[in-house]
Regions:
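Extended, histidine- and acidic-residue-enriched regions that form the cofactor-binding/catalytic faces
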Residues: 1-95, 99-115, 121-276
């Protein structure tokens, strides 16, 4: 299986092919995640791999509905403020991440792409706030960029009302939940199942099935999100959840729901822009 993070992206296209896509008024999906520890059973590229899978499937759905779409090479030098106490969690300063991301988006804009959508499945709030602030700033300067995320994320970040460049995606917790017996938010049942479905060769299945669920409570989250040694003390093996609860059938349903929800929001955004 091809495990390249450049699979299906512009990195595999020639420049005339990219120019042709621009002439076809193609939309651009920009995968934005990180390289981060995901316990002893998952690879550090988990967020990037899964974001890439989602982007390719969204692209395919959009193209089936007649909307030309390309995927930009992934941006994976972001912020890991919770897992920064672990080896393998690359984290850069907010200013560095913003500067690099701005210039990447400015490149796409200058070439003539009229719709640029950021897609990220990295749940670090400092990372997500950096994305939102970057997109809002660029959008204020007429950049055709937008950031899609679960609507609950924008609510927790305090964006109300939402600017047009922040696109909320409605995902029901009941629909996308796999593990319900414990807090499962990092390298647990959800991500382990998803990686087992899409990149089984990158999952240490024997290790995953031997791991015990973490016992964090809501009152522990305040300490956990501080990162560094505080987070590592609570989750010394680098996961928060139940990795042994691998459910391939359920994660397929979750993936389909995520693809549908994101695709629908992009199409609505494109139709709104066309009508303006």
């Amino acid at each position: 299986m091809n495990t390249s993070v450049f699979k299906g992206t512009m990195a595999e296209m020639s420049y005339p092919q990219i120019e042709a896509a621009i002439q076809q008024q193609a939309a651009v999906l920009l995968p934005v995640s990180v390289i981060e520890e995901h316990g002893p059973h998952l690879c550090t590229g988990t967020d990037m791999y899964l974001t890439g899978v989602v982007c390719r499937k969204i692209r395919d759905e959009l193209q089936q509905q007649g909307k030309s779409t390309v995927i930009a090479p992934p941006f994976y030098w972001g912020i890991n403020s919770i897992t920064d106490g672990f080896t393998g969690s690359f984290s850069i300063r907010k200013e560095t991440a913003q500067a690099l991301l701005k210039e990447i988006i400015e490149n796409l804009d200058s070439w003539g792409f009229q719709h640029i959508f950021l897609v990220s499945f990295h749940g670090d709030f400092r990372h997500m706030r950096m994305l939102a602030e970057t997109v809002i700033e660029l959008h204020s300067k007429s950049s055709p960029v937008a950031y899609l995320a679960d609507q609950s994320i924008f609510q927790q970040l305090g964006y109300a009302p939402l600017p047009d460049c922040l696109i909320p995606v409605s995902l029901s917790p009941d629909t996308i939940a796999i593990e319900t017996s414990c807090i499962d938010i990092h390298a647990g049942a959800m991500e382990t199942s998803w990686m087992a479905l899409q990149y089984e060769q990158l999952v240490d299945m024997e290790c995953a099935k031997a791991l015990q669920p973490t016992q964090l409570k809501l009152c522990d989250m305040k300490q956990w999100i501080q990162g560094g040694s505080s987070a590592k003390q609570l989750t010394p093996l680098g996961y928060c959840g139940n990795p042994a609860n691998i459910q391939l059938d359920k994660i397929q349903q979750v993936e389909q729901e995520v693809i549908r929800a994101y695709t629908d929001q992009i199409l609505m955004n494109l139709m709104k822009a066309a009508a303006a």
